[in-house]
Amino acid sequence: MKFVFFHLMPYPYLPDDFDENHPSPSLTFPSKYFDRQAGNRLYHRYLDELEYAETVGFDGIAVNEHHQSAYGLMPSPNIMAAALARRTERAKIMVLGNAIGVRGNPLRVAEEIAMLDHLSNGRVVSGFVRGIGWEYFAHSINPTRSRERFNEAHDLIIKAWTSDEPFQWVSPNYEYRYVNLWPRTVQEPHPPIYIPGAGSSETMKFVAEHGYTYMSVYAPTSVVRRWFDGYRQAADELQVEADPEKIAFSVPIYVADTDEAAHREGRRHVEWLFHRGLKQSFAQVYPPGYMSPGSMRGLLLSGMKPYTETSYEELLEGGYVVVGSPDSVAARLQQLQQQLGFGQLNGLFSIGDISHEETKRSMELFSSKVMPALRPLGTAQNTVAGS
Amino acid sequence: MTEAAIDVGADTNGSPHEEFLEFPGGRVHLLRGGAGKPVLFLHAAGGAGQWHEFHALLAQQFEVIAPDHPGFGGSDELADVEGIDDLVFHYLDLIERLGLERPHVVGASFGGWIAAELAVARPDVIGSLVLLGPAGLRLPDHPVTDLFLLTPEQVVDVLFQDPAKASVLFPAAAPSVDDILAAYRDMTALARFAWFPFVSDPKLERRLHRIAAPTLVACPADDKVIPVAHGKRYAELIPDARYEELGGCGHAMYFERPEAFAQITADFLAARTASAAEPSGASR
């Protein structure tokens, strides 16, 4: 098992009337609620936590991209990765990922990741995501072109990283007369690629075909199981090995000394994340054309409730989050690992409005008491029932 | 032209014929009803594929031809039609395919934008022009409401002056999965053309002087989607255009006050048809 410490960098200081008067922390939540000094302190606190994760034994530290939102304060994940690159030595620096569907200029992403690979001495992991629906509003990118922009940008970036000679790139959404990347990446042929999946069979096949890592987004275990099974099946059909370490399970985790303390403290942080951070309208998340007709039908028929209507108890039972004493968390994650067959755990420890002290304590307990129990699981030699 | 039209409808009691026209990449669905000088009706973002009271009223005096835009209603998404310029060529093809000679063109909201672009590109091809609450201009001081971001309840509130009339456009109290998918498909089709630049062609204003057709611009006085400043600007820049405002009505226009919008449209077109002294129904 590989352990990743993932950060969203939320802005937790919402106004008292947020629940009543603000439909979402994203896109239209006024930036006047961003306190400059408090925000400034947050960035440094969050970067400290990412650095501390390496110290306590995480294999990777991960950042991601969100725009115009209190849900996450990293419009440019590459800047955060740069800040971490020279302050850490061992952990993978994981950008999960650049929202190449939204970015105006994908060549810039290829350039920045290549630079990061040098700053980190070859530790960069490059995730590619489409970007959440509201970000297509935020950056005026046509969501009906999201899928093709993502595919074209991916192909362009990979070719830019692997080509030894200048080339011309012409595709429906991008045109470059000269692509000739300086610097090349340290890693050869290029950094590992991570792609999130949320049920699309095209994505499963795409990830398996390229040997990329498939990572889940926050969903119930039954749903994640379908996704991971789909990915393994796609790999089988392509006759490539579905290495468990290329299946990454994403989950918020809170560990305290006892179950009682963990739930007492953890509940509000989890509720902040799912009931405030992820408070968003259907139109915000699924702008027109962002979903294919088939995916939209699947979503409507799945009966998945909006996050805001899913109670803390349901989040726990559904496997959206894991909270408890070290023993309980280890047991629950072992159980989930048995069911899902992942070899990489992408944990969110700095959940919602959690304090720095609680985060650190949770990380320490996880590292000293949970990691050892899980470490042997989910390796290629130690395959599981789920596969 | 080619005989690609497949008539699958029946003509009883003034109900429309349903036809399909084959195009590269798919087929286009259209409704046709009434008799007289042909009127090409270009629908708004909502209401594709349906024959409303407004259509029936116009069809008492004209032959009304109401195609669904590519990707809307019963029309396939035509991969090659992905921008407003493509839509202009698409409708020039359609006019030619149907053998329409200088048809009147009536467009509402998004369809009004297409109608204006058509009249700019080929002033010689159309008869008279009626723009109902037209979209298409980029007027930063008079922003268009972002329908893409609204909840279903908010959509009703901004579209109708009297929300009680919304059932004309949104009949189902609790929409089925298929209803939601159909609405998502129409909005996706709209977004292809209208996401960016937002429901507008920044170059359209400077080209409106090319329009030669007698033009009526009619706007609902209580439009909360496209401020009436847009209609006024159209009327200002199109040579000799007439501008009218209809009270007690929101942007839903022909869904909220079908008689009023049919009347003002029919009166304007009838006057033009008479003064042009052309034999009616020339093409058929």
Tell what function each PLM region has:
Chain A
Residues 14-16, 105-210, 225-229, 233-238:
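Internal, glycine-rich beta/alpha segment that forms the wall or movable "lid"
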Residues 74-95, 366-375:
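Alpha-helix-loop-beta-strand connector modules within alpha/beta enzyme cores
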Residues 29-44, 98-107, 189-198, 253-256, ...:
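Active-site mouth loops of central-metabolism enzymes
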Residues 3, 53, 57, 65, ...:
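Conserved, mostly hydrophobic/aromatic
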Residues 5-34, 147-184, 222-342, 375-387:
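An alpha-helical appendage that flanks or caps ligand/catalytic pockets
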Residues 54-55, 81-89, 113, 117-124, ...:
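Acidic (Asp/Glu)-rich catalytic clusters
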Residues 62-80, 100, 219, 348-358:
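Glycine-rich, proline-tolerant flexible connector loops at the mouths of alpha/beta enzymes
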Residues 1-87, 191, 384-387:
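N-terminal beta1-alpha1-beta2 module of alpha/beta enzyme domains
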